[in-house]
Amino acid sequence: MPPRGLELLIAQTILQGFDAQYGRFLEITAGAQHRFEQADWHAVQQAMKSRIHLYDHHVGLVVEQLRCIMEGKATDPDFLLRVKRHYTDLLPDYPRFEIAESFFNSVYCRLYDHRSLTPDRLFIFSSQPERRFRTMPRPLAKNFFPEQGWQPLLTTLLTDLPLRLPWQDLARDVRYIIAHLNETLGPARLAQAHLEMANELFYRNKAAWLVGKLRLPDATLPFLLPVHRSDDGELFVDTCLTGSAGASIVFGFARSYFMVYAPLPAALVEWLREILPGKTTAELYMAIGCQKHAKTESYREYLHYLRHADEQFIEAPGIRGMVMLVFTLPGFDRVFKVIKDRFAPQKEMSEAHVRACYQLVKEHDRVGRMADTQEFENFVIEKRRISPELMALLQQEVGQKLTDMGDKISISHLYIERRMVPLNIWLEQATGQQLRDAIEEYGNAIRQLAAANIFPGDMLFKNFGVTRHGRVVFYDYDEICYMTEVNFRDIPPPRYPEDELSAEPWYSVAPGDVFPEEFRHWLCADPKIGPLFEEMHSDLFSASYWRALQTRIREGYVEDVYAYRRRQRFCVRWKNHNGHPEAAVSAIAPSAVGEG
């Protein structure tokens, strides 16, 4: 085959491989409605894992094909550049060009073991950056105007959903939504508003989300409705979210990816950007399940920051870890985590174990309590960007992962993660209600992780962070395990009075044994924290609490986990109004509810 024909064949093979991958991605995503209708929550969890694995699987298939057809050209740099040019020529009219570029990068990295990662060989920057703002041909959303009032508008919106289940009480849910809108906006502003709703539902866990925009003359607000399925197979709306902070949490970096049918992901990302202005492009792609392209965008955001900030990398604030070396740029919103060459003596584990823990988190339901990460190999940093103190620490702690490249160093493996304030630092500075909220959040994080079959292992405050919305998120994964793998035990009574004074336990301790009573020693040691913890979370110190959760997990029960406060649920917010919340909201205008 002539060289130019071979180069084109390779480019076409890579793009065809991506087509196959994204086709399967959409196929799994399209099954979300059926899984929701059938309440097959275990299938929901399996589909999430399968969709994540798809990408690497198809990259591997393409790499095997290319190794068979490259005819020894793999080491010819000019040949590789021509392949990329051919691939670029295939993309101008390609609907998912931006993710196809990331797929090319992944194939290249797999073929060449993450070496020679330069802009001429990879799509480190997009070949068509202007296309993401182009009007897409397929309408993503539909407008709803309250010409006859909000009651018929919302009734139409909900009854037109593709879900093939009856409503528990549609009129009640419509009243709830209208009451929330009146309470939030007031009747006068609501009368001037209309909705723009995404055509596709956003599925995650046990909810199907309607995602839309509440358009007002002077503003555009998020409009989010989580639809749930009752145990009797009936639909109900659990709440209505119209605040930017609430929407940001729903699409947060600590949550599992949505299943939303998006044949044109760039168009959906641009549409979402208006109601999620605090989210980066990487975070938006991550939220809709395009996590590998989100990694590309995350790296581009990092490069953009470097171009516009003259800062040096420093060790991240907080207590130094026993397994990870963590560093950051002072003004950047992410941290860089490198597994140390040697762990502290009490950490009896291997690097392979740590990597497996991070992969577990990637694939598991993170329930809003575990930060997502992007994994990089051969990550290059200019030496001038590294503070002398950090350089010394890198050489001391992760020297085996460093390669000297003259004016740069390469780190063979690291994770990038969203930066948070370490909880121990937050608690040192918090007072009053802020302290109380943080302790409540910490306990809720532990409970929700446990309900999702995750035991953090090391529950010290330093292993948790606080987000900009005040949520507590777990981020130290080296001791993480499934709840069902742990043996929760009560401490046996002492045999003799002197047993309690002994430095050694008077009872046997096997691998996997955990004694929740011991949590009290380090979680309640601070006198300003202890009473709050005892008040709100004392059951966490009881082995019976943990064993009861294990029983539910083993029986196959999947807990409900909400992306909003319990008090925001309609059934809690208006539980004393018998489905008629308008009694709690003053001056609901007839025009607003369509009754005048």
From Swiss-Prot:
Residues at which ATP binds: A316, P317, G318, I319, R320, G321, M322, K337
Signal peptide: none
Alphabetically ordered keywords of this record: ATP-binding, Cytoplasm, Glyoxylate bypass, Hydrolase, Kinase, Nucleotide-binding, Protein phosphatase, Serine/threonine-protein kinase, Transferase, Tricarboxylic acid cycle
Reactions this protein catalyses: L-seryl-[isocitrate dehydrogenase] + ATP = O-phospho-L-seryl-[isocitrate dehydrogenase] + ADP + H(+)
A GO molecular-function annotation: [isocitrate dehydrogenase (NADP+)] kinase activity
Residue numbers annotated as active site: D372
Subcellular location(s) of the protein: Cytoplasm
A cellular component term, taken from the record's GO annotations: cytoplasm
Gene Ontology BP, a term: glyoxylate cycle
Pfam family, one: AceK_kinase
Purpose: Bifunctional enzyme which can phosphorylate or dephosphorylate isocitrate dehydrogenase (IDH) on a specific serine residue. This is a regulatory mechanism which enables bacteria to bypass the Krebs cycle via the glyoxylate shunt in response to the source of carbon. When bacteria are grown on glucose, IDH is fully active and unphosphorylated, but when grown on acetate or ethanol, the activity of IDH declines drastically concomitant with its phosphorylation.
NCBIfam families assigned to the protein according to its UniProt record, in alphabetical order: PRK02946.1
Xref: HAMAP family: AceK
Family as reported in the entry's similarity comment: Belongs to the AceK family.
Name recorded for this polypeptide: Isocitrate dehydrogenase kinase/phosphatase
Annotated organism of origin: Cronobacter sakazakii (strain ATCC BAA-894)
